Every structure is written in structure tokens, then in C-alpha cells.
Design a protein with these regions (language model features):
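Glycosyltransferase-associated regions of secretory-pathway enzymes
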Residues: 2-168
Length: 168
């Protein structure tokens, strides 16, 4: 992505081989799954089979359906699903999947996009400033409200709103 700022050398990561990073972290007792985001930083090696698999996947996709509905699935979702099929585990640790090193959120994405709080650690190499230009106005407003009043209260208010107006 163009909104990524490199703050620390990545020589050790690059020397290790192909890599990508996660844009989220797992919360104790939570139900989230890792989301691997190539836009945070992507290191490749020649003839990496995973790249061919991704190209083959995209070659068969349609991004506009009959009736002009759009395929809204992101590269993060496609990448994560393919990595899960190849052995990605739902853990907050460095792991090697199909010759690709997958790094936890703290390495390439230290900002929590919901709260805008940054948690730079000794492992952080870059910062994804997360413009979220693809998100709808409603989704952007939810992020802004969550930053002001907190994610839990935003979730409660969102559920109440859906109950009142009858939307899922």
C-alpha cells in the first residue's frame, strides 16, 4: 500500500525469505481469525508456488456479477483463505506457511484502525497508516465513532440501531 511508512530496517526479515504480515491480532477469548494483508509488506522469492496459486485464483474471479453487484471480497480475504488451506494457524506468532513467513500485527501494522492507537514495539518495522479509502461512508463513520466513544459502546449502539430499524 502507499500508506505504509518503513521505520526500521527489515534486512533480517528479507534475508529469511518470502514474507507477509497480519493486519489484526487475536484477543484472548475472542472469535477473530488472523487476516494476512499483502499490502502491509510483501517479500517474494523466485518461483514461489503461492504466487502462482494466487494468480490462478484471480484469473477465475469475476468482480462484477449479473445485475451489476460487485465482488467486495478483498485481497486480504483471498490471501488469508489460501494460506489457511496451506496450513496457516490462528496464532499470534511468526509462522512459516508454504515457504512464506507470516508475521504478527506488531511487525507491520501497529495502529489499531478502530481506535487509531499505535503500539510500536521493538519488533515493529513499518506502520500502515490505514486510509481505508475503499470503505463506505457508513463504515468510516463507525470507525470514527469507535475512536471517540470506544469499540464496545459502538458495538452496543450498532446492535441497538439494527434492532430499532430492523436491519441485520
Amino acid at each position: 500500500d502507499t500508506d505504509v511508512e518503513v521505520i526500521k530496517p527489515m534486512n533480517d526479515i528479507i534475508e529469511r525469505g518470502a514474507f507477509m504480515g497480519c493486519e489484526n491480532e487475536l484477543k484472548p477469548g475472542g472469535t477473530s481469525i488472523l487476516a494476512v494483508a499483502p499490502g502491509l509488506g510483501l517479500g517474494c522469492i523466485p518461483r514461489l508456488g503461492f504466487n502462482e496459486d494466487m494468480l490462478n485464483l484471480y484469473a477465475g474471479l469475476h468482480f462484477q456479477y449479473a445485475g451489476n453487484d460487485l465482488n467486495q471480497k478483498t485481497v486480504v480475504e483471498y490471501t488469508t483463505e489460501l494460506l489457511v488451506a496451506k496450513g496457516l494457524r490462528n496464532i499470534d506468532d511468526i509462522q512459516c506457511v508454504n515457504e512464506i513467513w507470516i508475521y504478527p500485527k506488531e511487525y507491520f501494522c501497529p495502529i489499531d484502525y478502530r481506535t487509531n492507537k499505535m503500539n510500536v514495539t521493538c519488533n515493529t518495522r513499518s506502520i500502515h497508516h490505514f486510509a481505508a479509502s475503499w470503505k463506505s461512508w457508513d463504515e468510516k463513520m463507525k470507525i470514527i465513532i469507535a475512536r471517540i466513544i470506544g469499540t464496545k459502546l459502538t458495538h452496543i449502539l450498532g446492535n441497538a440501531r439494527r434492532c430499532i430499524i430492523g436491519k441485520k
